[in-house]
Amino acid sequence: QRHFSDIPNKKLEMPVYSDSLFSNKEVPKFHHVESVRDRDVLKISFDMPDDMPFWESKPTQFLAHLLGEEGEGSLLSYLKGKGWSLGLETSTWWRMFHIKVQLTDLGKEEYEDVIRACFSYIQLLKEEGLKNYIFEERKKLADIELKYIEPKSSMGRASQYSASMLYFPVESFLSHYYLYHKHSQEDFEKFLSQLHVENMQVS
């Protein structure tokens, strides 16, 4: 406020983008790209609603955590057990959610089975929901991470934080940005419901 209070607030309305990224039926579901690296990656991408208004429950972060787990019973452990995958990661950016699977030679041949396995695991999440103990674990870890937050470039942090301040209360910005404030099964299911075949692209 000390540095920016002289800038007039024009109270402009935020633009709303309601069209689905993958709603056009003429857009191919599958894209094959020759890799310049010595590895093959299967990427399943989903169009998602804007998750910033859901900062209290952070549903996309739980989706990324649950689908990206590496322990026993995880999606990755199943794919590795089949000899299809060397690694898996999830990511979110704006209105996109990605599942990236690093394929073995066998996984490349049987990529359709890899996709089916991903959707089987998504169905399992729909049946089980977001369990309270998982929320509490992530909540405690976030508390610790904020307490011992690693320094990063001032420019990068300023850009990241200033954009997020459109959604978070300025007075308690950091806690709202990093921490989990409520366990919402409804929010989790809202975003989980977007992970379906009609709403995906594969590359």
Regions found by a protein language model. Give the residues of each.
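Mature, solvent-exposed C-terminal subdomains and processed small-chain segments of exported/organellar
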Residues: Q1-S203
